[in-house]
Amino acid sequence: MRIGIITLWQSNDNYGQQLQCWALQQALLKLGHEPYLIRYDIDGRINNTKKPLWKKILKVVLLYPLIKKLIRIKKDKVEKGLISYNATKNKERRFDEFRNVNIIQSDTVFKNLKELQDNPPQADAYIVGSDQVWAHLLSNYENRAMFLDFGDAKVKRIAYAPSFSMQLYPIGLRQELVDNLSRFNSLSVREKSGGNICKKHGFDVSVVVDPTMLLTKEDYNVLQSNEKHTKYLFLYYLNISNPEDIEWNELKRIAHKEGLKVIATPASGYFPGRELFDGVEYQYATINQWINLIESAEIVATTSFHGVVFCILHHTPFIYFPLSGKYSRGNNRVVDLCQDLSLSGQIWHPKASLEEMMNNDINWADVDLKLKNMRNESQNFLYNSLI
């Protein structure tokens, strides 16, 4: 069966985004299907089809008094400078090369929903997912693409592990949500909170694992690099703007005490990644190198869901630092996963001792057994959805 997948794919520094895309294709290939990525330009990066958010904000700010105008311009200048710096460093990560070599892609890049509707990608089934594809609200008509509002009605439509990244869908958009969910033949989500949203609106839904967990550690060997490092703590972070968001001074003290150097890799999520920490070795790793950095670390400190996932797959001890404020909605996926695998003790909280957490004795055999059961259920959902 030929299967078109629509998901997030354009990041040049978010490792989890690329690997969930690759992993779902691999899982479908194992089932004997012919998957490919539908290259939908949701970010408006190609030919500048969409005005960047910072420009829209700036346009509004220009209507305000001069002082607000100057503050906004300065902030935009800083952010644009950061984006420019990241673009230079991201060349070292070689994500374009990874996509071109490892991900089967549509020849066409669809720049908007109308192009998808006028010239729909040919497939026997469409899948949306995974990642936070349903965090893009239906108040923007273009986001109906992530609810598969294109193509022949006879084509099967499946949601595999999409994330809403919210607890409740906005009241004013709930009928829109019902209309768009009604399009699917099979529905699943990645988080329990997403399952509750669907059930509240009358839909049967399965909660399944992220595509990266459909595969085993051995499946990722084809992507491994074999670089060696002296003993180190790996710091993989995104969505933080202050070193103390991850208790940096204490973390640094413990690493020094244990004789561990610190290797750090920043990434972009809700906002651009940035270098925040002193006395660390920054590596803008390729995807293959990133997997190796997690597997070979003595311990990983991370704010990333996929950082946690790959620690679990490779039996690498980890500490997850929850996001705070308006970004705390991103914690649900990690909390759900760690609860399901009896790993909640690896989630930091203000009363926790980092030193004790770093020395927790994780029962990896128990984790593997629980993950195997979750994986089997998710594989069965995928298989049955495509019969």
Predicted regions and their residues:
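Active-site anion-handling motifs in enzyme catalytic cores
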Residues: M1-I387
